[in-house]
Regions:
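Forkhead-associated
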Residues: 17-79, 118-187
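Short polybasic amphipathic segments
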Residues: 3-8, 63-66, 102-107, 162-166
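Hydrophobic, helix-prone linear segments
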Residues: 1-22
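Glycine-centered tight beta-turn/hairpin loop motif at sheet-sheet or coil-to-beta transitions
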Residues: 10-12, 31, 85-87, 185-187
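A structural signal for short, hydrophobic beta-strand segments that form beta-sheets
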Residues: 1, 92, 192-193
Length: 193
């Protein structure tokens, strides 16, 4: 299992990039080895989300409430669906029908540990920008950035007009997305950890 990496975007937030076909969710406490940890009233191992083809399936470890109905069997997640793990409410969204990438957001007062804006369940691509179909909304950006998978590696495609520098050097072509890289442009500033 690959632990999610965190994408920090200046002025926007921090996002867990979940690249595995199976993501575990549970309570945040020392020694708990879930992929996505939540500070809240939730069991240590509450659920698993599996990628099945282009879809995501919620596999409850404890009973969950999906749209208000108690479920203890696998549930196919749909755009906009809300589910509760203990007293923690989560919303699943798929902003673009052209991508299997989805977004998990906590509703209410609970928080991810480490502190995140959202968790991104990666498919083959992830779009960052101001548009409503972007997986990561960056309201002040006039350009879109595309993260895409090629083989087992992730790449970043940034428009030429964005004047982007990678570790201080101007970039014109898609580049591998690597931990520790600082990507900066006129509106864009982000780093993967």
């Amino acid at each position: 299992m690959t632990a999610p990496k965190i994408l920090w975007i200046d002025g926007v937030g921090s996002f867990a990039l979940c690249d595995s076909n199976e993501i575990s969710i549970g309570q945040a406490f020392p020694g708990n080895s879930v992929d996505l940890a939540i500070r809240g009233d939730i069991s240590r191992n509450a659920a698993v989300i599996q990628r099945v083809g282009e879809d995501h399936v919620l596999q409850p470890v404890q009973p969950v409430f999906v749209e208000g109905t108690s479920m203890d069997c696998p549930v196919l997640l749909a755009d906009g669906m809300k589910f509760s793990l203990g007293r923690v409410e989560v919303q699943y969204s798929r902003p673009s029908k052209l991508s299997s990438t989805a977004r998990l957001e906590l509703l209410g007062n609970n928080r991810w540990q480490p502190l995140l804006t959202a968790a991104i369940l990666l498919g083959e691509s992830c779009v960052l920008g101001a548009g409503s179909t972007c997986h990561i909304r960056c309201p002040e950006w006039s350009e879109q950035v595309m993260l895409f998978r090629n083989g087992g590696e992730w790449f970043c495609r940034i428009p030429v007009t964005a004047n982007v520098k990678l570790n201080g050097e101007i970039v014109r072509a898609p580049m591998p997305l690597r931990v520790g890289q600082r990507i900066r442009g006129d509106e864009i500033s982000m780093i993967l950890e």
